[in-house]
Each structure stands twice: as structure tokens, then as C-alpha cells.
Amino acid sequence: MRPSLIAIAVALVVVPEIAFAQTDEIQVYDGGHVDPGVFNLTWHNNFTPRGVKTPAFPGAIVADKSWNGVPEWAYGVTDWFETGLYLPLYTRDKNYGATLDGFKLRELFTVPHADDRTFVYGVNFEFSWNSKHWDATRFTSEIRPIIGWHLKPVDIIVNPILDTAYDGVKNLDFAPNVRVAYNFSPMWAIAAEEYADFGPLRGFYSVSDQSHQLYGVVDYSSKALDFEVGVGFGLTDASDKLTLKVMVARDLNSKH
């Protein structure tokens, strides 16, 4: 895991504000990733029947009644490193219609064989190029630490995320995710997930201005296909009131 520690140190020097904006990936990272030599495709789709009706910045996509998604292409490099590409990121909203919104590169470092361990840890880095209607800043990034416990049958996972628009450490935005899951079998699980955005480290937003969403999630996993569906409810005025998410994933080739 030494490479991940070096990466964290480098990122904290250059990373730095981000306004509330749309998100294409509603997922808590648990430290697992595809085997070395395997290509994987995860298709993310989200629909917001009742969302925030005002844009996060002038010209931004409006969340209310919008649909967005992205194919996530991943490749297992080693048993502790996975690389990925999100492309194309797309949205359909009531103002712009169908749009293309940018792309992301992802680098995930984790303890080897995380799915088989009781205590898991890792870190994920994302580097985004954004269209002008998707984010107020052209280039943004994410640092996502991963801390978790597989207690069989219960999983507890925490991602204390820091988002940045490269404008100073004090402007790093704290947006943690938490997942508590119960595994009925190796194939089926249910979970509660919380996605939050407290605001910049220099001074969190007031509670009513923070974003907090609570999701109920069902997961199915097999050798051929992984599937996740979730329903999210906003807990504050700044949150989308109702969001639906679907993720479908499968390996595209066999392990060498």
C-alpha cells in the first residue's frame, strides 16, 4: 500500500472548492475491485423525480426530473490497484435536453483481497473534465479514503471524501458516504447508505444548506452479473427529495 500513501501526499499538496453539483456515481466504495487482467463494465443510471429546482450555478443542469448516467470502464492492474475511465457522462434535463457532460479518470488503491478481509482500507482518486453546464470548474478531483469492516453478515463502510477544484486546501469540500449492509447470502444483500455534503473545510454550511440523502439499497451478485437498485430520500432543504439509482456490472473477459 506504499504507493497509495505517496499518492495521498501528492494529492493533498495540489488538491483544493467545489459547489453542489450533479453527481453521476451514487456508490459507496468497499475496497473490492476486479481481478488483475480483467476488464469490467459498470453502467450507472440515476433519475431524480423530485429534485432541487434551482441550478447550482448560472447555466447549470437542474436536478429536478433529470436523468444522468455513465459507463464505468475498469481494469485490474494488480491485486491492489485498479484503473478506470468514466465515458461518456450524459444527462437529460428539462432545460437542455440530452447533453454530454465530460469524463473522469479513476485510480483505486486498496489492501489486496479486500472482499475476504475483516478490516479493509484503501483510497480512490478521480480526475474530472467537466462541461460548463455540469460543473462551474472545468477540472475537478476527488480523494476518497475507504475504511470498512466485513463482520459477516454485516458490512460497515465509510468513505470520508474530499472534493477539490484546485483552489487551496482550505476549500476542500467534505462529502462523506456511509454504508451499512446485511448480507442474506453471497448473492443478496440489503443496505442503508447516506450521502452527504457538509461544505468546505474552512467552514461547513448550516445544516439546512448541507446535502444529506438516505438510500435504501438492494444488491444482487453472481458470476455473470452484479445489480444494484436504490431509492434515496433527501433529509434537508438543499437535498434532492427523491432519487432512484441503478447500477449493472459485469466482467468483459475471464481472469488470465
Task: Tell me what each language-model feature is.
Residues 1-25, 254-256:
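Cleavable N-terminal export/targeting peptides
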Residues 20-256:
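Transmembrane beta-barrel domains of Gram-negative outer membranes and organellar outer membranes
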